Amino acid sequence: MDYTQILIKPLVSEKATFVKESSEQVVFFVNPRANKIEIKKAVESVFNVKVAGVNVVTRKPQARTKHGRVTGQTAGYKKAYVTLAPGEKIDFFEGV
């Protein structure tokens, strides 16, 4: 899998911002078929940083019901919490 297909987009939320400030971690939405090794190599090659570790959270699609009937599914996704090596930094929205 190509590195540009692994990282979908960075996650920007209150929790992701808190994690980024408290520990040297960055959160990404990633391709559901990507594994930890591929995610690590993709972040290192795209952002030119050293990665200390990767934790992955997978959310499966949930059935949506309306008036007792199943109407579809919510989207499933995979998030990667990437821990950067000490001294490394990725600036997404600095100064915004």
Curated annotation (Swiss-Prot):
Keywords for the protein's UniProt record, in alphabetical order: Ribonucleoprotein, Ribosomal protein, RNA-binding, rRNA-binding
Transmembrane segments: none
UniProt-listed InterPro entries: Nucleotide-bd_a/b_plait_sf, Ribosomal_uL23-like, Ribosomal_uL23/eL15/eS24_sf, Ribosomal_uL23_CS
Pfam families recorded: Ribosomal_L23
Family statement: Belongs to the universal ribosomal protein uL23 family.
Function of the molecule: One of the early assembly proteins it binds 23S rRNA. One of the proteins that surrounds the polypeptide exit tunnel on the outside of the ribosome. Forms the main docking site for trigger factor binding to the ribosome.
Name this polypeptide is given: Large ribosomal subunit protein uL23
Gene: rplW
